[in-house]
Amino acid sequence: MINTILGLILAYLLGSIPTGLWIGQIFFKKNLREYGSGNTGTTNTFRILGKTAGTVTFAIDFLKGTLATLLPLFLHINGISPMIFGLIAVLGHTFPIFAEFKGGKAVATSAGVVLGFSPLFFSYLIIIFIVTLYLGSMISLASIVVAGFAIISVLIFPLLGIILPSYDLLFTLIIILLASIILIRHRDNMERIKNKSENLIPWGINITKQVPKK
């Protein structure tokens, strides 16, 4: 019981590490909340601090989710799904105690959670992400599409017997919850995509013809 409580606390604290915010403050003397979208996640870090900072931010945020799902293994915790620890880490990332409970959009950390629990399902989703990213040139659109596919797939694949061969109720519910968090956190992006003014990355074909505002 003590190990379980300790593990859940560690998962939240791990998720609460505001990677982009701290990198900006320590190495660039910039507060990401005052630049670009004001978000402290991977996309805004890339845009404001550059490729190296963005890559490091993504890697750490991603690993937060994966490591959280492995905490039961490290702490010898039985009887509780690793997905619970992953979910707690994502909640920590979204509402971090180290950053006034104002966190990122949960994409990288959620991806890390999925990898830690179901590498095959992760591989399927990452293919969708890359294809959508190339077509739209928008990380936000790719994240939104993947979240939608995750919800549909976790419900349908066990029925079809592919990738997810059987229903796992807890896994299904947590995937739906993580995807819902991502969709809710991207509401502003959805509005910009609708208005064709979303920020782009310099890769892909921008099929929706977005024109970001200067």
UniProtKB/Swiss-Prot annotation:
Membrane topology listed for this record: Multi-pass membrane protein
Family matches, as InterPro entries: G3P_acylTferase_PlsY
GO cellular component, one term: plasma membrane
Subcellular location: Cell membrane
Domain of life: Bacteria
GO terms, molecular function: acyl-phosphate glycerol-3-phosphate acyltransferase activity
Entry keyword set: Cell membrane, Lipid biosynthesis, Lipid metabolism, Membrane, Phospholipid biosynthesis, Phospholipid metabolism, Transferase, Transmembrane, Transmembrane helix
A GO biological process held by the record: phospholipid biosynthetic process
Catalytic activities: an acyl phosphate + sn-glycerol 3-phosphate = a 1-acyl-sn-glycero-3-phosphate + phosphate
SMART domains reported for this sequence: G3P_acyltransf (SM01207)
Record family assignment: Belongs to the PlsY family.
Assembly and oligomerization: Probably interacts with PlsX.
Name the UniProt record assigns to this protein: Glycerol-3-phosphate acyltransferase
Species assigned in the record: Streptococcus gordonii (strain Challis / ATCC 35105 / BCRC 15272 / CH1 / DL1 / V288)
Gene behind this protein: plsY
